[in-house]
Amino acid sequence: MDNSDILMNMMMQQMEKLPEHFSNSNPNPNPHNIMMLSESNTHPFFFNPTHSHLPFDQTMPHHQPGLNFRYAPSPSSSLPEKRGGCSDNANMAAMREMIFRIAVMQPIHIDPESVKPPKRKNVRISKDPQSVAARHRRERISERIRILQRLVPGGTKMDTASMLDEAIHYVKFLKKQVQSLEEHAVVNGGGMTAVAGGALAGTVGGGYGGKGCGIMRSDHHQMLGNAQILR
């Protein structure tokens, strides 16, 4: 399975995770905002197509009409017959960005039980201070890796090295989105510092990012919260 197939599988997995309830009752939805309904609260999520680098103009098929983002077609159906390395890389980058845009529309919820280390049976544990300290250090690293796997789109389906590489791309994507939000706030004359401070405090204060995230009052909050967790 090549990289394009892996990215396509990741995109399909992310789409399956999208909640079923989108605000598609409005016949003329605002293309700059997508409203998503989670369990009991409505969370607005920011999507700015003007900053997208996707070269595709086809609307996503087989999905809810309320979604307003561009779809990166399958490499086998849209790329020219003579595909060079540059076109393949551009298509993979576009597909990766599509996956990330789907991922940022999802609320972050990590079950603390899912990141606990597996229980070891019939294993003698050394009580030597150095061994204990080394074991605790390894456990902390493993716990952070498991958390990161659940934050990175498709991270639970990858090996650690691939997941870390994908995390780098995800952080770069989130940084670009934060810059877009800051530019958007400057153009509108808004105070981005105050908005960002409140969003990051609310997100980080929610522990693993579960129910403590609360209700995001603007479409800036979710993107900034995702970026802060990955920093």
Curated annotation (Swiss-Prot):
Provide the gene name from the record. HEC2
Tissues in which the protein is found: Gynoecium.
- Where is the major localization of this protein? nucleus
Among the Pfam families in the record, one is: HLH
In its UniProt entry, what is this protein called?
A: Transcription factor HEC2
Question: What does the annotation say about its assembly with partners?
Answer: Homodimer. Interacts with SPT.
InterPro entries given in the database record: bHLH_dom (IPR011598), HLH_DNA-bd_sf (IPR036638), IND-like (IPR045843)
The UniProt entry's GO CC annotations, sorted and at most eight, read: nucleus
At the top level, the lineage of the source is Eukaryota
Q: What does this protein do?
A: Required for the female reproductive tract development and fertility.
Q: Where in the cell is it found?
A: Nucleus
